[in-house]
């Protein structure tokens, strides 16, 4: 890499550190000619698909819009920033792994809803109400009833999971998700 100060074509890396989220590497460099030091950030460059909007228009994926969607849905909700970041990364990962050059906006919306459903049910219903254009209280009620029935099914499956684990000689799982003695 060339030197930002003297334009010499050779610099050497004197220190490298991975960021906390593991997505970037900060490199400290020194110019072989003038001795000046500077830092660079190295990130992975992966193309995200172009988003096909409902009106047929196309636009580049915008991570800020994704962030805004999560922020609005989870406004004043007790969800840790770290979990929101993980959910956003999960959406981006799903889009990348789809391997498509273009993705309809509805796919992005469904990915966001899937992650919000795991994070916070109130945030999920908020997002769904806008995304699916709820018209009245009945639409909210219907979505909440779907959520409740899914929670009931997963609660009913826990005893089946415990029984299966015990039959295989594994300790059971209590309601808190911890292994029993």
From Swiss-Prot:
Binds 1 zinc ion. GO terms for biological process: negative regulation of DNA-templated transcription. Disulfide bonds: none annotated. Keywords: ATP-binding, DNA-binding, Metal-binding, Nucleotide-binding, Repressor, Transcription, Transcription regulation, Zinc, Zinc-finger. A zinc finger (unnamed) spans 3-34. InterPro entries: ATP-cone_dom, NrdR-like_N, RNR_NrdR-like. This is Transcriptional repressor NrdR. Negatively regulates transcription of bacterial ribonucleotide reductase nrd genes and operons by binding to NrdR-boxes. One of its GO terms (molecular function) is ATP binding. Belongs to the NrdR family. Pfam families: ATP-cone (PF03477), Zn_ribbon_NrdR (PF22811). Its cofactor is Zn(2+). Transmembrane segments: none annotated. It comes from Xylella fastidiosa (strain M12). The gene is nrdR. The lineage of its organism: Bacteria, Pseudomonadati, Pseudomonadota, Gammaproteobacteria, Lysobacterales. Residues 49-139 form the ATP-cone domain. NCBIfam families: transcriptional regulator NrdR. PROSITE patterns: ATP_CONE (PS51161). It comes from the Bacteria.
